[in-house]
């Protein structure tokens, strides 16, 4: 019996033009290019400079332009728009609706979803559910963040890590034995204090006090985040590999969330996957949140082949994490 599969048929991405270098960071806090590169693996990150009317939807529209230049599509054929972001333009209206309007997607529904740095793989999970149900045939996923709005550039622990960016993907129905195969998704809200932005929500709405107390900036316990990120990403990847009877040699690519280089190396070392098969671009972009996996796919697209076996894995605030196993959907043009 034929089975409907969900397959990625196109990708796009965009990062702002402005490069915030380690040298510039070192003028703001007590650090150095050498220390940041050694400890985090980042040389520079892209920042969306504050300008009136420009937020994450601006980056998203640029990413969709890139997608359209790589893989032309008809906006009227899109059934749903899923936008994974922790930094929407506004509390409401949702950013997905604004993007759909500007792209000309008029026959679809859309919503924002928030899973922090795990947003892209969570969105893939939702898109797959829509498609294999038979109700929807083409879903646009957008995943991105303007994390610079959460950064206290006087904080040595967080200011070097994060950058801004956005990626997107078309996910379509196919009867071929290709596309998304299996996944494991998890969350754990038992220690939210380890990685958070506590200001601006319904518990701590914006006031002079929340601003003065810096509740609108990201705070993390780096050691706790490192430990949980490595153990949970490695564990879900290993379980997914075993569940699908894969050998390590069969995996063509691992695409990890670009949290920091030490986390990426620790996870792939656990999996015994060689560096040559791991997509890493954190040196150029930093941690771009939900955008990091699709930005890697954009950069490596020309090296991908139809049927390549791939593992995506991510970890983010919440905690949220997971891993996705898929067979790549097309040969690059």
From Swiss-Prot:
Subunit: Homodimer.
InterPro entries per UniProt: ACP_syn_III_C (IPR013747), ACP_syn_III_N (IPR013751), FabH (IPR004655), Thiolase-like (IPR016039)
GO cellular component terms given for this protein: cytoplasm
Name of the protein described by the UniProt record: Beta-ketoacyl-[acyl-carrier-protein] synthase III
Role description: Catalyzes the condensation reaction of fatty acid synthesis by the addition to an acyl acceptor of two carbons from malonyl-ACP. Catalyzes the first condensation reaction which initiates fatty acid synthesis and may therefore play a role in governing the total rate of fatty acid production. Possesses both acetoacetyl-ACP synthase and acetyl transacylase activities. Its substrate specificity determines the biosynthesis of branched-chain and/or straight-chain of fatty acids.
Record gene name: fabH
Catalysed transformations (reactions): malonyl-[ACP] + acetyl-CoA + H(+) = 3-oxobutanoyl-[ACP] + CO2 + CoA
Domain of life: Bacteria
Gene Ontology biological process terms from the UniProt entry: fatty acid biosynthetic process; secondary metabolite biosynthetic process
The protein's Enzyme Commission number: 2.3.1.180
Compartment(s): Cytoplasm
Family classification: Belongs to the thiolase-like superfamily. FabH family.
Active site (UniProt): 117, 257, 287
Signal peptide: none
Ranges where the record places region ACP-binding: 258-262
Keywords, in A-Z order: Acyltransferase, Cytoplasm, Fatty acid biosynthesis, Fatty acid metabolism, Lipid biosynthesis, Lipid metabolism, Multifunctional enzyme, Transferase
GO molecular function annotation: 3-oxoacyl-[acyl-carrier-protein] synthase activity; beta-ketoacyl-acyl-carrier-protein synthase III activity
């Amino acid at each position: 019996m034929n089975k409907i599969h969900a397959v990625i048929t196109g990708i796009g991405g965009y990062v702002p033009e402005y490069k915030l270098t380690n040298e510039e960071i070192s003028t703001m806090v007590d650090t150095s290019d050498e220390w940041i590169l050694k400890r985090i693996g980042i040389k520079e990150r892209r920042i969306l400079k504050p300008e009136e009317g420009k937020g994450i939807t601006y980056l998203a529209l640029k990413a969709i332009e890139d997608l359209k230049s790589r893989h032309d599509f008809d906006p009227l054929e899109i059934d749903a728009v899923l936008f994974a972001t922790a930094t929407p333009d506004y509390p409401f209206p949702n950013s997905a609706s604004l993007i759909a309007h500007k792209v000309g997607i008029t026959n679809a529904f859309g919503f924002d979803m928030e899973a922090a740095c795990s947003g892209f793989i969570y969105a893939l999970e939702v898109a797959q559910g829509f498609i294999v149900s038979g109700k929807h045939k083409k879903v646009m996923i957008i995943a991105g963040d303007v994390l610079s709005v959460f950064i206290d550039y006087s904080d040595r622990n967080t200011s070097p890590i994060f950058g801004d960016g956005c990626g997107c993907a078309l996910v379509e129905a196919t009867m071929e034995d290709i596309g998304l195969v299996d996944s494991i998704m998890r969350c754990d809200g038992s220690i939210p204090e380890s990685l958070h932005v506590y200001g601006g929500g319904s518990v701590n709405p914006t006031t002079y006090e929340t601003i003065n107390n810096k509740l609108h900036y990201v705070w993390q316990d780096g050691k706790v985040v490192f430990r949980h990120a490595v153990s949970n990403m490695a564990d879900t990847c290993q379980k997914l590999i075993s569940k699908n009877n894969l050998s390590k040699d069969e995996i063509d690519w691992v695409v990890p969330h670009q949290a920091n280089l030490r986390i990426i190396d620790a996870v792939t070392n656990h999996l015994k996957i060689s560096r040559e098969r791991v997509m890493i671009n954190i040196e150029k972009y930093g941690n771009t949140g939900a955008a990091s996996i699709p930005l890697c796919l954009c950069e490596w697209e020309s090296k991908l082949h139809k049927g390549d076996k791939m593992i995506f894995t991510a970890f983010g605030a919440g905690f949220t994490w997971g891993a996705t196993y898929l067979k790549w959907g097309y040969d690059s043009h």
